[in-house]
Amino acid sequence: MNSTSEGNPTPPSFPRLCYAAAHVVMNDDYRAVDHSVESPGSPDEIARYINWDATMAFRRHLDGHGFGIAEAMDTAQRFSLGWVNAKRLIRSCGNLELSERFVAGAGVDHMNSIHSAGDLIEGVIYQARIIQESGGIPIVLPMEWLPQHGAHEQTYIDVYASIIDALDGPLFLHWLGESFMPSLAGYFPGDSFFRIMAHDPSKIRGAKLSLLDDAFEWTARARLASDDQ
């Protein structure tokens, strides 16, 4: 591997950038805490045991191997960490001066309650702007409130369009299937996903699809490629 003048490894060049959803590194004494994958503890409890230096060093390690960093992104771990810890991860990642701009999930987990689609829009914009101010690219996380309230296709389009219009690009969308989160069953009803992706292709540069549906993902890749997404 080549090295820079400072002695740091030069990331290899690849035709595509692969993003690694890096997890956090915990201090050894977390082993003694009563926890499991399903019940890792409250965000405040978890924060006491995060080894922040090792967590950031892991991101530098991945960057050195040519990976982009998807920060505060792995859905299950993100929501276990809570927004306060996620925000610290995002800002700390932004201070690493990585080879590639990192991406990070923008959602509404900082809000105690959501009463309307307008609350959703404001919440996502708030987090997305923090990500952008930190030097990252927002990935709009799926919004559980929409399927929980039986939102129709046009509501999805209106919510996402309002978020997209309020932000600078580039942006990405995340579509998480019900296999990973049953409460998201029926997400993006009708043709809403493709209509949203077509709203402003110059801003919406792509999507992360976690659907376990290879046929649909092939179809989506072909359709989006026509808009250089």
Task: Please annotate each region the language model reported.
Residues 3, 10-12:
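Polar/charged low-complexity regulatory segments
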Residues 3-5, 193:
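Residue-level detector of functional hotspots within protein domains
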Residues 5-6, 25:
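Charged, compositionally biased N-terminal leader segments and the immediate start
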Residues 168-229:
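Catalytic alpha/beta core domains of metabolic enzymes, predominantly
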